[in-house]
Amino acid sequence: MAATTLYNSCLLQPKYGFTTRRLNQSLVNSLTNPTRVSVLWKSRRDVIAKASIEMAESNSISSVVVNSSGPIIVIDNYDSFTYNLCQYMGELGCHFEVYRNDELTVEELKRKKPRGLLISPGPGTPQDSGISLQTVLELGPLVPLFGVCMGLQCIGEAFGGKIVRSPFGVMHGKSSMVHYDEKGEEGLFSGLSNPFLVGRYHSLVIEKDSFPSDELEVTAWTEDGLVMAARHRKYKHIQGVQFHPESIITTEGKTIVRNFIKLVEKKESEKLA
């Protein structure tokens, strides 16, 4: 298993299927025989989510102490768009590391003491996302977490929602106007136009009828009513978007990534206060 440490760097967009090892970056923290994590919440999902969050809260001081020296960790769900997100973070001066979703366990991830987490887009469903679902549940309550496309779907499923085919079909490279409401609070869309233009690359969405409104709140939507962003009601630093902020179609996408980094910095300052 290997990770890639990234600083201010300009990354070329790789073709689909490139791995972190094939980019011109330094490899660090090599570990042998990583344990694969099986995520089991097709049944009793709400019970597992509640138990995982309670465990995360109880361990927040002893085993998952967050400090400013840790990186933002990107969980790559085998998607080339991950590197566009990385490029934005590099341009914004962010120190981060990238791991494929089967390169390390959640326990290994905790030991890295991340400042924040980004769950990338990817093919398939949240059940195909390796450690992403478990990461949302166990680390989401502790550090800022930003899910993009499949990352938002992982947030939705982790907290009890159902991921279904979009009633409007496949949206691949399509543009939409997105409206948002963060209730006057600073969030991912702070400073953006309302509505704003986004690029969409997905066929799945969080089902409207099963949306876990007791746990999550919708913060952005399309004109036809599909959920385009959500955040946790209690842990407002758990946020995700269905569209792609790194797409050239998304006119203010870099601002969204910058707002996530600001959220990480704000959370750190609160811990130090």
UniProtKB/Swiss-Prot annotation:
<dbReference type="GO" id="GO:0000162">
    <property type="term" value="P:L-tryptophan biosynthetic process"/>
</dbReference>
<keyword id="KW-0809">Transit peptide</keyword>
<keyword id="KW-0456">Lyase</keyword>
<keyword id="KW-0934">Plastid</keyword>
<keyword id="KW-0315">Glutamine amidotransferase</keyword>
<feature type="active site">
    <location>
        <position position="244"/>
    </location>
</feature>
<feature type="transit peptide" description="Chloroplast">
    <location>
        <begin position="1"/>
        <end position="36"/>
    </location>
</feature>
<comment type="pathway">
    <text>Amino-acid biosynthesis; L-tryptophan biosynthesis; L-tryptophan from chorismate: step 1/5.</text>
</comment>
<dbReference type="InterPro" id="IPR029062">
    <property type="entry name" value="Class_I_gatase-like"/>
</dbReference>
<dbReference type="InterPro" id="IPR050472">
    <property type="entry name" value="Anth_synth/Amidotransfase"/>
</dbReference>
<feature type="active site" description="Nucleophile">
    <location>
        <position position="149"/>
    </location>
</feature>
<feature type="active site">
    <location>
        <position position="246"/>
    </location>
</feature>
<keyword id="KW-0057">Aromatic amino acid biosynthesis</keyword>
<dbReference type="GO" id="GO:0004049">
    <property type="term" value="F:anthranilate synthase activity"/>
</dbReference>
<dbReference type="InterPro" id="IPR017926">
    <property type="entry name" value="GATASE"/>
</dbReference>
<keyword id="KW-0150">Chloroplast</keyword>
<keyword id="KW-0822">Tryptophan biosynthesis</keyword>
<protein>
    <recommendedName>
        <fullName>Anthranilate synthase beta subunit 2, chloroplastic</fullName>
        <ecNumber>4.1.3.27</ecNumber>
    </recommendedName>
</protein>
<dbReference type="GO" id="GO:0009507">
    <property type="term" value="C:chloroplast"/>
</dbReference>
<dbReference type="InterPro" id="IPR006221">
    <property type="entry name" value="TrpG/PapA_dom"/>
</dbReference>
<dbReference type="Pfam" id="PF00117">
    <property type="entry name" value="GATase"/>
</dbReference>
<feature type="domain" description="Glutamine amidotransferase type-1">
    <location>
        <begin position="71"/>
        <end position="270"/>
    </location>
</feature>
<comment type="function">
    <text>Part of a heterotetrameric complex that catalyzes the two-step biosynthesis of anthranilate, an intermediate in the biosynthesis of L-tryptophan. In the first step, the glutamine-binding beta subunit of anthranilate synthase (AS) provides the glutamine amidotransferase activity which generates ammonia as a substrate that, along with chorismate, is used in the second step, catalyzed by the large alpha subunit of AS to produce anthranilate.</text>
</comment>
<comment type="subunit">
    <text>Heterotetramer consisting of two non-identical subunits: a beta subunit and a large alpha subunit.</text>
</comment>
<keyword id="KW-0028">Amino-acid biosynthesis</keyword>
